[in-house]
From Swiss-Prot:
It comes from the Bacteria. InterPro entries: ARM-like, ARM-type_fold, Nfu/NifU_N, Nfu/NifU_N_sf, PBS_lyase_HEAT, Virulence_F_dom. GO terms for molecular function: oxidoreductase activity. Belongs to the CvfC family. This is Conserved virulence factor C.
Length: 372
């Protein structure tokens, strides 16, 4: 058995270790104590001082450490144990998804009733208020099968603590599907054969957007916005400056990230300085997807961000796009207190010092390949 790569996870106490072999029994187990009937390599890792538990599924381990232990000291011992060697991994692989939490909402005939969050190491679910459950059940016909007709709708990637994200996403869903509209959704579901209503896009102007002070109505406008262009900078720039509601600023950043022109950079830079770390990280992700090297100075500044999910994105961007000009900034931050960030900075320094080409993000590499 060999280690393919080590990946950080949104939990500071969990590391994901990808192996070159899959479990033959297709099962999953959590191990907390050494037992004779367990695989030897599991017991060997559990014997490492500081390891709390191991979750083993498919081709990876999620190793949990005790809070007082430092990954910088503990991880080499774990990897050495798995490798049957005294050395850890020579060339760790960059993780394109550090800190990401996938948000989804479960719908039946367009009526939402459950939210699910999934990180690399944890899943969390929450039912919406009872009126949504009742509406979902009321929309069911005699010959309907909820299990087969329900559908998970992807709400995109979020960042932060799962409890905070759950509160934010739930608030968004309640805003997008107000209780006053539920009766109409139920009536429509019962009177038509349409199982999932087609999403309708509607372009709005800055004047229309500003005509309402209701943030929920504004969010519905942004969620229904078609692919934006430079002509939409006034509206989206205003939304990015929204002081009250994080979902509005985040959605505006997501839309701005669709505009593949350098003129969008000042707006995304503003997002990099937002008061919400989730918005800052989203802006960083957009800059990474666009891959404009003009963003390098701003990403160097982001290495000082108070939240590690933002610092990690900055280090990853420099790994993807940076050159010798960024070495001073990287070396200044190479002792970052977050091990995941420190690892990414070390990888960026190594690539640049070795003279390896900056290939850009995986998304950018795919886009360039498709253009050729």
């Amino acid at each position: 058995m060999e280690i393919v790569r080590v990946e950080p996870t949104p939990s500071p106490n969990t590391m994901k270790i990808v192996l070159n072999e899959k479990r033959k029994d297709n099962k999953s187990n959590t191990y907390t104590t050494i037992l004779d009937n367990q695989p030897k390599f599991i017991n060997d890792v559990l014997a490492v001082d500081g390891v709390k538990s191991i979750f083993y599924v498919m081709d990876f381990l999620a190793v949990d450490k005790k809070p007082k232990y430092d990954w910088e000291v503990l991880l080499p011992k774990v990897t050495a144990t798995l490798s049957d060697e005294s050395e850890s991994i020579d060339t760790p692989a960059p993780d394109e998804h550090f800190g990401e939490v996938k948000a989804e909402v479960l719908q039946f005939k367009g009526i939402p009733y459950q939210v699910k969050l999934t990180s690399s190491s944890e899943e969390k679910r929450k039912q919406l208020p009872e009126v949504y459950i009742d509406s979902m059940l009321a929309a069911q016909k005699d010959d309907d099968n909820i299990v087969f007709q329900r559908k998970w709708e992807n709400l995109g990637i979020r960042y932060g603590e799962l409890d905070d994200i759950m509160s934010e996403v739930t608030e968004e869903i309640l805003a997008l599907y107000p209780e006053k509209d539920l009766n109409h959704l139920v009536e429509n579901a019962l009177n038509t054969d349409v199982v999932i209503p087609e999403k309708k896009y509607q372009h709005v102007t800055l004047e229309t957007y500003q005509a309402t002070d209701d943030w929920k109505e504004r969010l519905r406008m942004l969620k229904a916005f078609p692919t934006p262009t430079e002509r939409d900078f006034p509206l989206l720039g205003d939304a990015v400056s929204e002081e009250e509601k994080t979902p509005l600023r985040r959605e505006a950043i997501v839309l701005l990230g669709m505009i593949e022109d350098k003129a969008v950079l000042p707006y995304l830079f503003k997002g990099l300085h937002d008061k919400s770390p989730a918005v800052r990280r989203t802006a960083g992700d957009c800059l990474s997807d666009l891959g404009f090297k003009q963003a390098l100075p701003e990403m160097e500044k982001a290495l000082d961000d108070p939240h590690k999910i933002v610092r990690w994105r900055a280090a990853m961007f420099i790994f993807d796009e940076g050159g010798p000009e960024q070495l001073d900034a990287l070396r200044t931050h190479e002792n970052d207190p977050a091990y995941e960030v420190k690892l990414q900075i070390e990888m960026a320094i190594a690539r640049i010092e070795n003279g390896d080409e900056a290939l850009g993000s995986v998304w950018k590499q795919i886009a360039n390949r498709n253009k050729s």
